Amino acid sequence: MIRLGSIVAVALLAAALGASAAAPEEGRPALRAPGLSPVPLPPRAHGVSPGSENAAPRSSKPEDSTQEKPPAPRTRAELLNDLYARLAASKDADETAGLIGAIDRLELESGSDAGDLLMARAVAAMAAKNYDVALALLDKLVDLHPEWAEAWNKRATVRFLVDDDRGSMADIAHVLKLEPRHIGALAGMGVILEREGFRDDALRAYQRALQIAPQLKSLKDSVERLTKAVQGEDL
């Protein structure tokens, strides 16, 4: 049995809805229920998905495919080319020293963690004058990274330090095949040739290095000294 209270409540609800809601505008959606007057729906209640009222309007403008992309990182070879070009054009001794330092740091990078670790150990052994240990490490290094000019240059240096001029020159030749601009290798070649009495050839090696680093004082001094010596021999 329906209670009287329920009937009264329904009647009051219907009356309230009818009093508060005006007749729906023509063409405007409305909520309709049996026994109740049509209730107009608010404008955003139809044709709108939940949460879409806060969504940013979608731009009809197509994305610009010509937007500039960030430049790709420069390769090691590109960085070296730039440093050597700046070195050749340098007019200042301090700038030259800084550029040579930057070149040396780049040339010490193998591109692999294992190679860099072996090189660090070899350099430490050289500093401690443990030349046998340094040679063993560098032998391994040139086997692992035969394309790495600095590995050959470091072994050339150790061989020079233990008076193995022939072995040092062989390694220097390999360095210059991989990196013809290697200043240390060219200077080392000049030192060995001069020590062996080949002053003309030593002078040419120093001059070649000086073309790469025109403001390096040690090379200037070597060229000046040997030029005088060679000219004196020709008199």
Go through the PLM ranges and name each one.
Residues M1-G27:
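Sec-dependent N-terminal signal peptides
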Residues Y84, G101-D104, D139, A173, ...:
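Alpha-solenoid helical repeat scaffolds
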Residues S112-G184:
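Alpha-helical adaptor scaffolds
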Residues R155-R159, M189, V223:
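Residue-level signature of tetratricopeptide-repeat
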